[in-house]
Amino acid sequence: MRFVRMGMFVTAVALGAGFAIAAPATTDSAARKELKRADLSGAPNMEVIASITELKPGDEFPRHLHHGVEAGYVVQGGMIQNPGQAPSMLATGAPIFNLRDAPHAGYKVIGPGNIILFTTHVVDKGKPLYDWVK
């Protein structure tokens, strides 16, 4: 068995999916680095995508949704601010879980350090990973 980072392994096992070798470039977000992508076993129209997103102070993470489930965790937390709200802490180690077609994010990173997110998406194949929400 190949060496797999513990976080990826736990997430993959929890979702019942294995990952492929290919890691194509992304065009949906400059902050997201795709790590692995594979078809979801037993579901021919779905795929599993593992990614790392790194957001720097001043970056905005636009409001968006996915055509499937997003699960993961905050590898490195930091201060964020949603429009019209007081700053809040996105805590290191916090879980990430967003249901199909549920709008989320829409915040600005206010620092002082970078925020790093590990995510696994189980989504409809052939659809964009992100649909931006106004």
What do the predicted segments below correspond to?
Residues R2-I52, I96-F97, Y130-K134:
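A short, N-terminal "cap"/entry segment at the start of jelly-roll beta-barrel domains
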Residues A102-G126:
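Ligand-binding loop in jelly-roll beta-barrel domains
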Residues M46, G58-Y73:
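A short beta-loop-beta micro-motif enriched in histidine and acidic residues
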Residues L40-G42, L55-K56, G84-A102:
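Short acidic-glycine-tyrosine-enriched beta hairpin
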Residues H67-Q85, T92-A94:
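Glycine- and acidic-residue-biased ligand/ion/polar-headgroup-sensing regions
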Residues A38, L55-P57, M79-I80, P95, ...:
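Extracytoplasmic low-complexity repetitive segments enriched in small/polar residues
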Residues R63, A71-Y73, P95-N98, L117-T119:
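Structural recognition of the beta-strand scaffold that forms the well-ordered cores
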Residues R63, Q81-N82, N98, H104-G111:
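Short beta-strand His + acidic residue motifs that chelate non-heme Fe in jelly-roll/DSBH
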